[in-house]
Amino acid sequence: MLNSIKLSAIVHATEDEDKVLEAIEFFIPENVDEEKIDLDVVETQGYFGNPIKIINVNVEGKEAKKIFKHIIDLIKSDDKNINKLKKDLHLRVEDNKFYVRFDKQKAYLGECRVVDGDDIIRAVFNFKIFTPKNKEEKVKEIVANELGF
């Protein structure tokens, strides 16, 4: 049912790009074929004209499923994450996509923390849903089942 995953993060001028990449890599298990990972770094400007980079990681197919399982396991390792997602899952699903933000600093330190803030790693899980109606309900059902609630 999972089609693809996109992980993205902003690297501010005051941050080390390698450390942000390490934080993103925390969400990618070692058994994923690196050749199946599409990594893109875009240099641009922030709202106030400050230089920033946007790191995008796209993965499809079987490798995306491995990452999804890994991220689900990371989320389940902390009850705070589960409680937060239980409370606001309806806000995190649109069409056939499930959106989650993770604390970028915590990820660098090897911790998974679901947050709503700005200094984040954004994950977008794109599901193949074949029914024309109730796509969002189907995605919520899949995610809730995976997370055990």
Swiss-Prot record:
Pfam families: RNA_binding. InterPro entries: PAB1135-like, Ribosomal_uL5_dom_sf. This is Uncharacterized protein MJ0213. It comes from the Archaea.
